[in-house]
Amino acid sequence: VRGAKVLADVDGDGIRDSNESQGTSDTSGSYVLNADPGSWMLITSGGTFLDSKGNEVNALPMKAPAPTTSGATSNITPLTSLVAANPSLKAKLDALGGDGWNADIASSSGVPGKLLRVAQAVEQVMMALSTGSNAILTSDSSKLKTLDKLADAFAMQENISSNESLAAATQEGLH
């Protein structure tokens, strides 16, 4: 995602305060924050990405746990958003292969299909609710709260990448 505001949210309110670092992602999606490792949360707002047809699409807000070491790389994706909302999903996503929950889902070197299935399910549900003239979720806050509900629903599933689990989690997460 390029052009996204990336916030190191210390107090969890999703709003930048004077003591919170913020940066903007560049054309490759990279960003730099001047923040010590800690118990804060990464939150994005705005930005765009190219879909599979090369069309520019507005990005959804996402989040990720703070890096645990200084200078660490942290991806911010639908997968990290699930883990930020429900840390118990780390183990389930890691079991799906590759870099697990912190996978770069846009990597040209590939990502395990099971991880992509989960990421795409989350993204498709969120896009369906957030785009178009009849969008149900219009604020970043409402979108992030819905991501939290989806994370809790995914955490209740045994095999989170199966068709049945994806359907059950997305249905339960929207109730």
Report each predicted region and the residues it spans.
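Feature for extracytoplasmic/surface-facing segments of secreted or surface-associated proteins
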Residues: 1-175
